[in-house]
């Protein structure tokens, strides 16, 4: 025990007092040397071999590793720290200066936290913020910011960083897609804008051209007349096109037209009636003549002398028959003509008059009428078309056939060919006004011969004119026959 002496003076003398010194308290010494409870509990928890699967020392024994954070927070924290928040445990480690060693796992280390050296825990102190003014206050704020950033890094760890990186990647992909879409939209908008600008430029050019044309047209004095003329021409062309586009319907006249004669579209071809139509036109003219006598051969002849002379000129009459009546129209066409009377004397007179003036059938080109004959009449002999009569006036054909309506035809509907010369109606009138053959046949032979030559030449001339009109006898052949009477 230590004794301290204290000297006091009372006026003239000193006095000595002895007082005992105070003894140190053991509890205060222990409390000053003991580590913080958080560090002690953490050390005991890590050093426990029963929990090595959850938390244990590292291989270097200078740090500890939390292998299973969920089980650590669920089982160990409530037993030692009365809470189950792993983030709070990490923040508490940060206040005592622990750092995260490996970013991929929860490994923490401190210089005073080593395996087997628990006494070093006393060197670990808790970090406190400074309360000074000025620079001290700024240093405290800076240290607090560093502590918060370090604590944030410690709290995030491996899994937090991976999640953050994945989230940032997703955001980046979304932003890139949006950027690509906006660029495509901008490109399409630029293309549309360029197209619109080109259209506007073309419209402006057309307007300028239109205005310049109108200015020149107004200054031109013939503009209005030319414009009206072009309009009329266009209307006329449209009308012609509409007229030509209409289908033309032909009248049904009973004439069979071959397919070969069909004209191509858009061509104008002159209509040329076939030869049988011309023959029908000739028989229409002959129908208007007065009836004549018929000879033994049934030919159409004028006044004659006797049947004896007619039979003597049989060869000549056959030649005439070969020219004029060898290829006759069909029976239906002949039946429409009126009966003609003749006498045997007409045969000789006509034969002598036409023997030298009409050439042989070989020198002539005659139309073919055989295609007009029906099948039932083509096998009959030519004599069936005529009926000889030696007794005077008898019709050329049977009058009863003319009554049959089935054999009649309308001749007025057949058009005439424009290439044929017009009919000499004056000649037909003279033929109609001539007197028929007299019943008295007792005239002198000289008068009969003279009358026969005159009548025969006249009738031959008339027949030549009609034949020339039909186109059966060419003008060259007719001139040759007239030079050799």
Swiss-Prot record:
Protein's gene: HSFA1D
Molecular function per GO: DNA-binding transcription factor activity; sequence-specific DNA binding
Transmembrane segments: none
Protein localization: Cytoplasm; Nucleus
Lineage: Eukaryota, Viridiplantae, Streptophyta, Embryophyta, Tracheophyta
Name of the featured protein: Heat stress transcription factor A-1d
Annotated spans, Disordered: 1-34, 126-149, 229-269, 436-461
Family statement: Belongs to the HSF family. Class A subfamily.
Cross-referenced InterPro entries: HSF_DNA-bd, WH-like_DNA-bd_sf, WH_DNA-bd_sf
DNA-binding keyword on record: yes
Post-translational events: Exhibits temperature-dependent phosphorylation.
Polar residues biased stretches: 441-455
One Pfam family matching this protein: HSF_DNA-bind
Keyword tags: Cytoplasm, DNA-binding, Nucleus, Phosphoprotein, Stress response, Transcription, Transcription regulation
Domain remark text: The hydrophobic-rich region (HR-A/B) corresponds to the oligomerization domain.
């Amino acid at each position: 025990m230590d004794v301290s002496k204290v000297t006091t003076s009372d006026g003239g003398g000193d006095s000595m007092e002895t007082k005992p010194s105070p003894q140190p308290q053991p509890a205060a010494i222990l409390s000053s040397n003991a580590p913080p409870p958080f560090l002690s509990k953490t050390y005991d928890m890590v050093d426990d071999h029963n929990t090595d699967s959850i938390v244990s020392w590292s291989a270097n024994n200078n740090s500890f590793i939390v292998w299973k954070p969920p089980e650590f927070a669920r089982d160990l924290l409530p037993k030692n720290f009365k809470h189950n928040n792993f983030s709070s445990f990490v923040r508490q480690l940060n206040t005592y200066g622990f750092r995260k060693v490996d970013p991929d796992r929860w490994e923490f280390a401190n210089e005073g936290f080593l395996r087997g050296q628990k006494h070093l825990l006393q060197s670990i102190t808790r970090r406190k913020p400074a309360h000074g003014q000025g620079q001290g206050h700024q240093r405290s704020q800076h240290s607090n910011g560093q502590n918060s950033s370090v604590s944030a890094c410690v709290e995030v760890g491996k899994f937090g960083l991976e999640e953050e990186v994945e989230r940032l990647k997703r955001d980046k992909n979304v932003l890139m897609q949006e950027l690509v879409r906006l660029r495509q939209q901008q490109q399409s908008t630029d293309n549309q804008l360029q197209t619109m600008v080109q259209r506007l430029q073309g419209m402006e050019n057309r307007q300028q051209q239109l205005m310049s044309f109108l200015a020149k047209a107004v200054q031109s004095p013939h503009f209005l007349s030319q414009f009206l003329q072009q309009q009329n021409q266009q209307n006329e062309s449209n009308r012609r096109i509409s007229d030509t586009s209409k289908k033309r319907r032909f009248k049904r006249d009973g004439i069979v037209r071959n397919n070969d004669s069909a004209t191509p579209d858009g061509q104008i071809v002159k209509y040329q009636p076939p030869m049988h139509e011309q023959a029908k036109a000739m028989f229409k003219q002959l129908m208007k003549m007065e009836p004549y006598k018929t000879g033994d051969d049934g030919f159409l002849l004028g006044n004659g002398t006797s049947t004896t002379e007619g039979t003597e000129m049989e060869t000549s009459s056959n030649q005439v028959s070969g020219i004029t009546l060898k290829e006759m129209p069909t029976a239906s066409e002949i039946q429409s003509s009126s009966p003609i009377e003749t006498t045997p004397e007409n045969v000789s007179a006509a034969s002598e008059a036409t023997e030298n003036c009409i050439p042989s059938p070989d020198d002539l080109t005659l139309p073919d009428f055989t295609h007009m004959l029906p099948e039932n009449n083509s096998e009959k002999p030519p004599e069936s078309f005529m009926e000889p009569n030696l007794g005077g006036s008898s019709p050329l054909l049977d009058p009863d056939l003319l009554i049959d309506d089935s054999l009649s035809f309308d001749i007025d509907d057949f058009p005439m060919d424009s290439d044929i010369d017009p009919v000499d109606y004056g000649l037909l009138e003279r033929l109609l006004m001539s007197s028929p053959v007299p019943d008295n046949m007792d005239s002198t032979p000289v008068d009969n011969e003279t009358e026969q030559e005159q009548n025969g030449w006249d009738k031959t001339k008339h027949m030549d004119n009609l034949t020339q009109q039909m186109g059966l006898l060419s003008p060259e052949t007719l001139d040759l026959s007239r030079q050799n009477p």
